[in-house]
């Protein structure tokens, strides 16, 4: 069976780790991964003719030494919209607020906005994902709500003053995630960390400050990486410099390692899973064994 469509939807991640696409294009690794499905090692055993696109995507994501770019959970986005944004309610006399998502990505926050019943403005320069986001909007969006999708970088979006009720996003990680090769991509347009921080990240935060109504919130989901060790600290400081007040930090649970302290790799080896907190930075994670957390910083105008 031809599973090329499963691979074509997997984007690349920068760094030393292999990307799912690289596993797909490597005959040795791809064969080894498929054999693990056929033999039931690490995956549910399936005969060749029963292997689905979903099985292939799962294998490519979980292959040893592989990482991929991720999508923000729509349920988590909807929860934040429910808390921070008004909805249409004749009983309470409120109307649906408007949110801006500076980096739309793969549509997790758009789906969350649709589920929460709020108006949505999103910006992102990536052409393929923009087309997919239009399909999400057209298929799942509500006719009585507004969903404005703009194919541009967030640093160039100039909102009307005090027109936004909430700004929420997970910005691209400089030197870690590559979502496309468009010249408007922030890591291409601003190709050094200092330039990216000043011209992209700070400008995006400044645009959010301009657009937000007084007392409303900006929420940014970021995390330090090996390539950008102070992403969290820099993000908070830039928001303070723009004029925001850092009023809270919420923790997003990314994954849970069930069972004991060992796991089996696709190569059939048993390895120890170290679950201790090895985070180095200012914002300490909750100390819950087996869980990985990222901060969502909450700022108030």
Feature annotation, model-predicted:
Residues 71-94:
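Conserved alpha-helix/loop element of class I SAM-dependent methyltransferases that forms part
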Residues 134-159:
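S-adenosyl-L-methionine
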Residues 2-7, 11:
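Single conserved hydrophobic/aromatic residue that forms the stacking wall/gate
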